[in-house]
Amino acid sequence: MLDYGEQLLLPLPHQGIPELRQAIADHLAAFRGMTVDPENILIGAGTDFLYNLLIQLLGRDKIYAVEEPGYGKIRRIYAAGGVTTVSAYMDSAGVLPGSLGQAQVLHISPSHHFPTGLVTPVSRRLELLRWAKEGENWIIEDDYDSEFRFDAHPMPAMQSLDAERVIYMNSFSKSLAPSIRISYMVLPGHLMELFRQKLGFYSCTVASFEQYTLARFLSRGYFEKHINRMRKFYKNRRNRVVSLLQSSPAAQRFTILEQDAGLHFLLRVETQLSDRELTGRLEEAGIRIQALSEYYHQGRAEDLHCLVVNYSGVKEERLEEMMGLLPEIL
């Protein structure tokens, strides 16, 4: 960092340093099919901070549709920000446009939905973009975890299909490390102008040292090499988990619902236990895992007998032990 000298001590541009914004724009062009003006990129310390900026920018009078099932924290962030949320119901192709009702903002993870792993096909994406354009609505594209597809190239981002109605969000916390609290969003040009007028007084929340380091990591190709290594590592980890399940004495009671996206998969289990009993017994055995039914907010789905298997944080030596306990628990 000696190369930057006194620059590290200067006040930060409110949107983040130009070097990092340019590096992110280049990365998005190469890997997500997006043509992005670095001036439309905003850097922040974590997506929670950026979501709160969006609430202020779009207005608290808006109704936000959130995927059902979905990541519960998103709904809590919006509620804490004072906005009304409704459920965006899904079928096998993703969010149903007809379920959006009076919503004016849709929060969606089309390239890797959590917890189902669903990848929204182009036809459904175009339907949702039509909903946004015709109603002058907004789509917040949460692209978290999209780097980790193992057997196919990632589908281009929705933002690449319509840069005027889509707000793109992503973070480096999963692809690098949770302690690296660097996230960013790409705003449509006219929305960025409004941001500068309305919220441009906010200071950038990421230290200059971290920004310059990440900018160099991206621009010199180290991030791409890192992602390729991690894809290989996690693919081997996934294959190990799948192999243990398939060789288990209870293998005939397991169905792996594979979507080739992200760092988890759904495991359907044949059992007489309720979801609550099943996850409770697993926790007693030292296996902390959630059922798919826990991710429903409205019209809660009971006893789907699907477990959300997140294998990214499990130590290799624990995998065989955990898989060996499953037949006894069931």
Where does each model-flagged region fall?
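Conserved PLP-binding active-site segment of the aspartate aminotransferase-like
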Residues: 187, 266-272, 289-329
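Active-site C-terminal subdomain of aminotransferase-like
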Residues: 192-210
